[in-house]
């Protein structure tokens, strides 16, 4: 979702925080760890799972600690003044507010856009699909074809969505189904200087169309592969080398001195 948020220049990418099962005994350290993981994924507004009322309407379990609707099933309790940690909650929430202020004020700069297949959008997609790139310091957003239709999805100075994440390259990730019109956009991106890495993709058919455009799509795909800044690979390990071959470097790096 952060790809959509970043390209379309939205104000907030919101999550309801600390709501999953098996967290009934989560400490503040656990909460901060989970929040940090989501902040790094692009979330810039986390809303703690709270209780919007002080008491029940019919007096049920009105004595302390009151009614806790999520106390069963291994779900964490709602954030409420009845909790034992409430006197210390400002330590956690003030940290959250500072982090979120920076994230909401700034503009994310992301190295790579990873475009996934239309059929893949119905599956659970892991943000660690290119772990070797993450380990090397690259950042990326997963995007779908719909994002290519955004007014902000254009290339300038060799970067996609230059007013937002300013992606330095586009990775076409295991794509079999695709629209002809969007393939033409990708070709224009490449002509405008955006490096394109084609990973394990065939572009063999048009999805959900009554028009027999499969042959046209294949023809356009062949045209894309002829371009100098387009590299095709079937190995996830070779994607990193392909990025180096088209001079795509990561935006940020760090060095640990021992």
PLM region descriptions:
Residues 1-258:
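Carbohydrate-binding surfaces of carbohydrate-active enzymes
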């Amino acid at each position: 979702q952060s790809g959509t948020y970043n390209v379309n220049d939205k104000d907030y990418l919101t999550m309801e925080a600390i709501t999953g099962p098996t967290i009934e005994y989560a400490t503040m350290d656990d909460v901060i760890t989970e929040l940090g993981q989501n902040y790094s994924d692009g979330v810039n507004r986390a809303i703690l799972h709270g209780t919007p009322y002080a008491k029940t309407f019919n007096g049920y379990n009105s004595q302390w600690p009151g009614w806790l609707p999520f106390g069963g099933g291994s779900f964490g309790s709602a954030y409420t003044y009845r909790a034992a940690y409430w006197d210390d909650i400002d330590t956690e929430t003030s940290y959250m507010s500072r982090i979120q202020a920076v994230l909401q004020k700034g503009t994310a700069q992301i190295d790579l856009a990873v475009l996934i297949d239309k059929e893949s959008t119905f599956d659970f997609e892991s943000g660690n699909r290119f772990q070797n790139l993450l380990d090397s310091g690259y950042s990326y957003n997963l995007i779908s074809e719909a994002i290519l239709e955004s007014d902000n999805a254009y290339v300038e100075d060799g970067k996609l969505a230059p007013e937002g994440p300013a992606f330095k390259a586009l990775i076409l990730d295991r794509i079999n189904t695709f629209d002809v019109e969007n393939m033409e956009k990708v070709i224009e991106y490449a002509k405008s200087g955006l490096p394109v890495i084609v990973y394990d993709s065939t572009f063999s058919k048009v999805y959900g169309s009554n028009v027999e455009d499969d042959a046209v799509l294949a023809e356009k795909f062949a045209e894309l592969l002829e371009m100098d800044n387009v590299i095709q690979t079937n190995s996830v390990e070779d994607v990193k080398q392909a990025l180096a071959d088209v001079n795509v470097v990561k935006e940020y790096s760090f060095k640990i001195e021992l």
